[in-house]
């Protein structure tokens, strides 16, 4: 191969390398630009609960919406089934966060105010206001508290003193055409049962007390037909 031929090969090799590098740089710029454009697309305005939502999410609290605020709010909404998932700090988003804060505050003493009877022995308590449930025996906490998802506006979980009257570990609802594992009925068609969805997903159930699978299973093992259930409070938004 002549020296001229070698120079041509080297020149073409360098040109190909430069083209490859340019293409890689262009691809990276497109990726970065796409990410920036995606973040910038979160353009919800400042909401009425901006400061509260910022504080809950650990964002800088200035009461003014930013792209980063919007993105964080939108992620929270997507996680907990809040629609529209727009990143707006509105009433429903703050309502969900408020319930979570109340649940955290309950700690291991959910009945510190004595609202659920302590003179009936073993009893399952359901606090609609905080969307919490637990099992106690007298003043002793046996299980929980755990988050629950109760009836939405129009199909509220009814309050009062009830008793479990029917149990079916593999119950199938012909009304809703859906499985209701670990179903324990205590008020007509209202039951504790397991669901495969977020406990904070609005607007709520058709009246039943939805539970996470592990919690519904624990209730199944702890409770029996004839055991007391006490439902009190009012679910936010109903």
Predicted regions and their residues:
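Short acidic, glycine/serine/threonine-rich helix-capping segments at coil-helix boundaries
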Residues: 40-100
């Amino acid at each position: 191969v002549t020296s001229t031929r070698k120079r041509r090969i080297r020149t073409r090799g360098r040109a190909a390398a430069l083209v490859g590098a340019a293409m890689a740089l262009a691809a990276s710029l497109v990726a970065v630009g796409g990410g920036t454009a995606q973040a910038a697309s979160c353009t919800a305005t400042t909401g009425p609960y901006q400061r509260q939502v910022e504080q809950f999410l650990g964002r800088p609290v200035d009461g003014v919406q930013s792209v980063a605020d919007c993105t964080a709010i939108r992620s929270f909404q997507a996680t907990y089934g809040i629609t529209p998932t727009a990143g707006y700090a509105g009433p429903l988003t703050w309502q969900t966060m408020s319930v979570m804060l109340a649940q955290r505050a309950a700690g291991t003493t959910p009945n510190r105010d004595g609202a659920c009877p302590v003179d009936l022995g073993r009893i399952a308590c359901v606090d609609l206001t905080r969307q919490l449930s637990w099992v106690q025996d007298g003043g002793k906490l046996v299980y929980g508290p755990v988050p629950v998802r109760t009836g939405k506006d129009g199909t509220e979980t009814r309050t009062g003193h009830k008793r479990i009257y029917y149990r079916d570990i593999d119950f199938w609802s012909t009304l809703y055409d859906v499985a209701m594992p670990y179903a324990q009925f205590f008020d007509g068609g209202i039951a504790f049962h397991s669901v495969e969805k977020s406990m904070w997903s609005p607007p709520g159930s058709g009246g039943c007390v939805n539970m996470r699978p592990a919690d519904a299973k624990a209730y199944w093992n702890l409770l029996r037909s004839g055991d007391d259930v006490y439902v009190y409070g009012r679910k936010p938004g109903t």
